[in-house]
Amino acid sequence: MASNLISRLLPSNTQGRSIYDSLRAHDEASGSDMDVEERAAMAIDEENLRFKDDELGNPADVISGESVTESTAFLSDQQQTPQKQGYNRKGKGKGRSHNLAESPRLLEEDSDDDVPASLLIEGNNRHADPETPNHIRARQTALPKRAPAVPGPSAQQIKEERDRAHWEMTQEQQKLHEDGGNRATGVPHTPQSIPQNTGFYLTGSPKDKAMYRWVNVTNLDNFIGDLYAYFEGAGIWCIVLAKVIDILTLVFVAVFTTFLTQCVDYKKIYRGDARSLEYALVPQCTKKISGMSNVAIWLVCLFVLYRVYQLLTDLPRLMKMRDFFTYLLEIQDSNMQTVSFQDVIARLMALRDANPMTVERISPDNRKFVLGTQSKQRLDAHDIANRLMRKENYLIALFNKEILDLTLPLPFLQGRQLFSKTLQWNLEWCILDFVFNDYGQVRQLVLKDSHRRELSDGLRNRFLFAGLMNVICAPVIVIYVVIVYFFKYFNQYHKNPAALGSRGYTPLAEWKFREFNELHHLFNKRLNMSYPFASRYLNQFPNVKTAHMAKFITFMAGAVVSVLVVATVWDSEVLAGFDITSERPVLFYIGVFGSLWAITNGMIPEENEVFDPEYALRQVIEYTHYMPNHWQDRLHSDEVKREFSTLYQLKLMIFIEEVFSIIITPFLLWFSLPKCADQIIDFFREFTVHVDGVGYVCSFAVFDFKKGDGRAPTQGKAKSDMREDYYSTKHGKMAASYYNFLDNYLLNPKTGVPGHNPPGLRQQFYPPPAFPGLISSPTSGADLQSSRMGRSDVRPMNRAPYVPQQAVRTPRFPSNTTATGSPMASILLDPRHQPPSSELGARSVRRSSRSRYQARRGNNIIEDPMEDENGPGRPVAQPGRSYAVDDTVANLGESTWEVSPAKADADGQDEEEDGDGTGGAGVLGLVYQFQKAQTNGRPGVSIW
């Protein structure tokens, strides 16, 4: 409807049909073939390269072009003609080379992200679907004509047994899933009694219903979005209560505003004719409401009914999600307010590995769509973040690369960027809804150079139409926002005038600070921790002139208030009957001068405050991860302070700018943003990549964990060319996002060390691993064994992280010594997404001493790559000192590495009483051990 309205109001394309018709026709023609990589048939099965075809049961002979099921995987009597690579099933003859020529960014795919087609297992209930004549005809056509089979089933049985043996051997080597008898205790599995679908509702136990819905999920983006919304809302009852309160707030604002504006005769109050409210009320005021007010009231009523309808329709979905959390993830609704999202991901991955089957009844067209972009095999922390932030990652990149023009050519604005929540809503509708289709994927037509001009014109028309709609809706939005803000904050400012000086980050600053694949609750947590340091930084720049004036005004206001208060206490009648000025009693001036004193007193800096702007700003950067290049060596300057002040403003000014932006947003949509249409279309074409099983995502959001942050060394390298600058992020956004992702999902938030492994899995690893970057010493293994890390108390089982026993899962991929062989690896990442083991060991050391290390550095802590353990600027651990262990290892707490758990149980208490221990190894350590052995149990003085 919106597209048709746009095409009618705005000039149409005279050269051909509308771009919306082209997009719609292209989407319908593509259908399930929207997966370019699946049509290309060029996926490499790197996981099975070391196995021969006969070991895998000859998958090339048994896998058809449409589907793979357990029941049809090894029908050896059906020989099929192999299909040529690059051939399009639609008959168009387009291969992979043609598709990649249209979208060069697809060349940057990582073959490690490909999910082998031979590993996708589906339901074995194939006979539930009766074969249609078309299926029988297609199967007969695919089978070559042959002579009748030799009578006797013996040869066929032998061949089936051989194929079954090959398949069982492949399952044993690949560890796709465990059988019911070998499945770990506590891991949920597919119930034996599948609920029956009667057409209107499911019959069976709640757990069976939840499992049936999970198995039949076809749109993982919507499902993961509902799951995250349920997690953020803290359960069904909190979500319902929040929605009800929002509706009641809207109703109260509408009723109270109507009462104040239409049902009260203020003239009677001013003349003194009305001694009480009942005399000032307008009789039958609802019949005297004007036409525009009636229209507004009816619109509000319709909107309230729409919100109530939304709430009622959301209840079944919320109840299904509650069953999913309760019965499959084993998270009760009472624990939703305290459970972490990392624990939810761990349970979801365990559920995925315990039930590696897709939907049972699915058409071939839908199978292409599900396995191409909605594969449940791609469901670790990295893939979930890409699904949840598929659109937000593009907006983060747009703001980082400064593609959007948010300025107006007005002299008094001086090129200032204007951004607000209102403009954000318009950008989401104009850009994201235009680029993404109904399935949440980037339209393939956007990725083609041939339609660049039409797409740019269509985007410009959307900007113009959005500006027109903002002009129509601006008066209503302004009135509603002002009324709600007045009702919400006036009493707070009246009771606490100092709250007028409170600050907050602007919407533009939030998009500049947010990083790729950083979920909303994690970003808010990081941002909230920076508020005290940001306020402290701005207080590091006191204006001496302002401070002197504030002291003088504070002194005068305090003197007047003190005299009036003393006079009132001396004679209470003065407060009621004495007027200082005409119709202004004593109480009025006490309030005025008291508020003035509170405001000016807040401008006076503390006398005992230490001024160090550079140190204070580094503390802010520690959490915001934002440090432009031009801030280098200028953190103490006033220019940096003014620039930071535009990002961290007074909340009152943020509200004023929000109201002002409602008025100027149409001008931005009419004059500034249409100039960026070509760059926006080019951006989506150049920075979109395809990930098998996930779909189209922003290229910056695909972290290459094998290569680290992807930054080349800056020392000894010439200045990067224009192409590298174009295809890279600014201000080190990519590297900051990569390391922040590791901090959130590689490190356990409860313990501060890598790994989310459950206790049962952690205790299985007794030998100490080799951590190349943990201690810069040739004897790091011996140092680790004798340090506190090996002598800490054994973690009690009841203090384990909130991860169920079902998290002990069998890996779906071949064993990887660097990823899964070490307990430092995170269980929230699949083997393909595990960073190198050297980075795992060094990450905890860098994180614990990061702030001190940054304070010593004089350059950007985010832009520069992490130095090597023995690189310049990093202290080298020496044998005679224990700071490397005491600062980074001794405080690991409960999730420390146990070299010998049995011995730690017996001797842990005695060793802790003896002090710091040997301190690692070396001559001094041996001397200390010898001295301790000689004096143990005898009186004497320790020489250590």
UniProtKB/Swiss-Prot annotation:
It is a multi-pass membrane protein. Residues 257-294, 571-584 are lumenal. Phosphorylated by atg1. Atg1 phosphorylation is required for preautophagosome elongation. Residues 70-113, 142-199, 753-881, 894-922 are annotated as: Disordered. Residues 907-916 have a biased composition (Acidic residues). GO terms for cellular component: autophagosome; cytoplasmic vesicle membrane; endoplasmic reticulum membrane; Golgi membrane; phagophore assembly site; phagophore assembly site membrane. Keywords: Autophagy, Cytoplasmic vesicle, Endoplasmic reticulum, Golgi apparatus, Lipid transport, Membrane, Phosphoprotein, Transmembrane, Transmembrane helix, Transport. InterPro entries: Autophagy-rel_prot_9 (IPR007241). It is found in: Preautophagosomal structure membrane; Cytoplasmic vesicle membrane; Golgi apparatus membrane; Endoplasmic reticulum membrane. Residues 70-86, 190-199, 776-789, 813-823 have a biased composition (Polar residues). Its main location: membrane. Belongs to the ATG9 family. Homotrimer; forms a homotrimer with a central pore that forms a path between the two membrane leaflets. Phospholipid scramblase involved in autophagy and cytoplasm to vacuole transport (Cvt) vesicle formation. Cycles between the preautophagosomal structure/phagophore assembly site (PAS) and the cytoplasmic vesicle pool and supplies membrane for the growing autophagosome. Lipid scramblase activity plays a key role in preautophagosomal structure/phagophore assembly by distributing the phospholipids that arrive through atg2 from the cytoplasmic to the luminal leaflet of the bilayer, thereby driving autophagosomal membrane expansion. Required for mitophagy. This is Autophagy-related protein 9. It comes from Sclerotinia sclerotiorum (strain ATCC 18683 / 1980 / Ss-1). The lineage of its organism: Eukaryota, Fungi, Dikarya, Ascomycota, Pezizomycotina.
